[in-house]
Amino acid sequence: NNYCKIKCLKGGVHTACKYGSLKPNCGNKVVVSYGLTKQEKQDILKEHNDFRQKIARGLETRGNPGPQPPAKNMKNLVWNDELAYVAQVWANQCQYGHDTCRDIAKYQVGQNVALTGSTAAKYDDPVKLVKMWEDEVKDYNPKKKFSGNNFLKTGHYTQMVWANTKEVGCGSIKFIQEKWHKHYLVCNYGPSGNFQNEELYQTK
């Protein structure tokens, strides 16, 4: 497993080395299903790109304060199966939060995670989870750089629209914990966004 040779900037053992397979490792949680269908992958990618283009065209009115300025260097993301594989390995641990080492050979990798739960036996569509990241824009102050904003409140939004990020790949798992039906989505992004003192994108 070549992932064991990858040295991440933040240290730690690579997720795909540490866990080594797509076998879910969820303790006493009952795994219902894992992985994304081809359609779900397309829908997640489209949602990212529609949102990036909305920002680029200056159509996002939300913010603290809004609106968000238009962008001149916002390109569409493409799906990357390797990013998706590493994201799926992490999702299959059923641990909400970020893993430590997820980089791939060609670049550093960023990450967004979302978890929803319901006592009804239904699971939110993955696009709904992506929209939760978009909604963080309401707390984003475009007059400040990335580090001037509250990372905990806006970090998923900023990674979604980071202009230098080119690729995305996601993994998903649905499980039951006590009486909660949970859907956990992990998206990995390359090259990573969210660097201190950098702009999300070039404004027009």
Curated annotation (Swiss-Prot):
Organism the protein comes from: Vespula flavopilosa (Downy yellowjacket)
Entry similarity comment: Belongs to the CRISP family. Venom allergen 5-like subfamily.
Localisation: Secreted
InterPro entries: Allrgn_V5/Tpx1_CS, CAP_dom, CAP_sf, CRISP-related, V5_allergen-like
First-listed, main subcellular location of the protein, grouped into a coarse class: secreted
Summary of the function given for this chain in its UniProt record: May have an ancestral function in the promotion of ovum fertilization by sperm.
PANTHER family cross-referenced by the UniProt entry: CYSTEINE-RICH SECRETORY PROTEIN-RELATED (PTHR10334)
Residue intervals of the SCP domain: 45-189
Tissue: Expressed by the venom gland.
Entry's Gene Ontology cellular component terms: extracellular region
Superkingdom, taxonomy of origin: Eukaryota
Official protein name in the record: Venom allergen 5
Disulphide bond pairs: C4-C17, C8-C101, C26-C94, C170-C187
Record flagged with keyword Secreted: yes
Keywords: Allergen, Disulfide bond, Secreted
